[in-house]
Structures are given as C-alpha cells and as structure tokens.
Amino acid sequence: MAEKLGRSLQGRPVVNNNLKLFKACGALLLANKTKRLLFLLRDNDTHSNTWGLVGGKVELQETVIQALHREIFEEVGVLPTINKTIPLELFRSDDGNFEYHTFVCVIDNEFIPELSDEHKGYCWCDVDSFPKPLHPGLWSSLNNEDIQQKLNTVKDVLEIA
C-alpha cells in the first residue's frame, strides 16, 4: 500500500555547535520480487545525465528517515511500503560539514515512478549491473568492496527468506 505525502519546505542546513552541518540522504530501492534496484537519471545542472539514487537534503526539524521518506515521495510520486530500511553507508566530508546517509529500502515490487522535474529517466537494474554513467559519489560508493559485499548479502538474505 502506497502513501501520499505533502510537499515540504526547501532544504536547510542543520546548525550544530555554530557550524553548518549539511545532511542529505539517499535510497537504493530494492524490489524483493525481482532483486533489482531503482536508479534515476538526473536532469539538473549538477551532474546531469548521470544515474543516481532517490534522495536529497535533510530539512530542519526532520530526522534522516523522515527526509528519506519525503524524498522518495517527491522524486518518484509515491511512497511504496518499505518492508526494511537497511543502512548502507554514512559518508562524512573531510571537514565534517557534510554527511550523506545511504540506505537500501526493500519494497515488494518494482513500479513505474512519476518522476519529478529533477529526473528524466529511470531503470531497475540487477545488484551487480549498474547503469552508466553513475553520479560520481554513487560510483565511489558502489565500487567500494565493503558496500558491494553488503548489497550482495542483502540480496542473498532476501532470496533465502
């Protein structure tokens, strides 16, 4: 069962000890039935024509999970029922002013997204076969051996269940 959410205010930095800490989050939606991941093709000025995750800024007064759900809805037009939310990676910039939380969100089935104006395409891909070119940050993450192992473990556990 999908849930419709209202749109919210623009992203704002979280203020922490007089430093601006920018938090963002992203979701690799994993369809349990097909074991495939959703990627979105970016259509904005920053890294346009690269494949990326559903995601964006964590707004003031939002938890990372609340932001994750809001971003999923805003970018694909629906919040599918998420059976499991599995932390995949927490990236922190060297200066400590930016962090990006990446999750695998397990859903039942693939769906056709209603894309926002931030994206111009989508694809569902196998865990070991990503579209090209990937967003540079996502490329770094998905080519990390530990993260590849985590993704394969999630896929294997779902196949056993």
Where are these regions (language model features)?
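Charged phosphate-binding loop/patch that engages nucleotide di/tri-phosphates or the phosphate backbone
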Residues: 137-161
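A generic structural motif
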Residues: 30, 42-43, 106
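Acidic, metal-coordinating catalytic segment for phosphate/diphosphate chemistry
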Residues: 1-26
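Functional cleft and adjacent loop/helix regions within the main domain
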Residues: 54, 60, 104-106, 112, ...
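Conserved Nudix-box catalytic region and its N-terminal flanking loop in Nudix hydrolases
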Residues: 34-74
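Residues embedded in well-ordered beta-strands
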Residues: 26-28, 36-38, 102-104
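A short coil-to-beta-strand element that immediately follows conserved catalytic motifs
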Residues: 79-89
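Active-site-adjacent beta-strand/loop module that shapes the phosphate/pyrophosphate-binding cleft
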Residues: 22, 33, 89-113, 117-129, ...
